[in-house]
Design a protein with these regions (language model features):
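Conserved alpha-helical "signature site"
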Residues: 1-166, 170-232
Length: 232
């Protein structure tokens, strides 16, 4: 009989990978030589993301007088920063939109929470004059990706986890770790590594709950942690 950890590894391997456009964009915007043309070129070769971005750009919300017909139009009308936010959010939507019944989350609930957390984390990063604010935004957006894999194990062990939370004052994350052998933040870090995210991204996702208090000195992790607390 396989252990929960072995089952988790199998589930991670079967998890649909995040669109490659996320890594490609983050690599470019972290470079001081990045340009609008490079960003547009990456996005326009992903038809699904392009269609989604143009649909969002041309929605009533933005109220543009002239419809955007290309990614370059969208960049000109919305600006690079806002376009990048839209692309990253649309790219991560599929992975985070399902039900997470073990966590009491209905369809779409985690996605809405993740977007709110990402937007707040970026605002904090700007206030603190942190570099790599788009990396912080993306890490905050995807920080709970581990829950998508851990969910069925949480459902199976919910009574045991709840008992630790109620009777022994464990946090839910601590109870996950105790019963299953790994918590969703650690698992999220594993997934981020498999998806070939940068070491910085992996580190932020893995430590976003600041279980290791020494990580409080890392302002990028602290920004995501604070955003998480604000959104709870």
């Amino acid at each position: 009989m396989s252990s929960p950890i072995q089952e988790l590894v199998k589930d991670i391997k079967n998890l649909q990978p995040v669109p490659a456009v996320i890594n490609q964009i983050l690599e470019i915007i972290d470079s001081p030589d990045s340009s609008m043309e490079q960003i547009a070129q990456i996005i326009q070769y992903d038809p699904a993301i392009t269609a989604s971005v143009l649909r969002t750009c041309n929605s009533v919300y933005f109220g543009l007088k002239t419809p955007a017909e290309s990614i370059k139009d969208a960049i000109t009308m919305l600006g690079m920063e806002q376009l990048i936010e839209i692309v990253l959010m649309k790219s991560g939507a599929k992975a985070l939109s399902g039900k997470q019944e073990g966590y009491g989350l209905q369809e779409g609930a985690m996605w809405k929470y993740s977007v709110s957390s990402a937007l707040i984390a970026k605002q904090i990063a700007v206030k603190l004059s942190l570099e790599n604010k788009n990396t912080i935004f993306t890490a905050a957006l995807l920080k709970d990706i581990g829950k998508t894999v851990l969910d069925r194990f949480v459902q199976d062990s919910f009574e045991k986890i709840s008992a630790l939370v109620v009777d022994r004052n464990y946090s839910f994350r601590e109870a996950e770790k105790k019963i299953i052998g790994v918590d969703h933040a650690e698992l999220g870090g594993m997934i981020a590594k498999i998806w070939k995210f940068s070491p910085r991204m992996v580190n932020i996702i893995r430590h976003h709950h600041l279980a290791d208090v020494s990580m409080i000195k890392n302002k990028e992790i602290a920004a995501v942690y604070l955003a998480d607390c604000i959104c709870m």
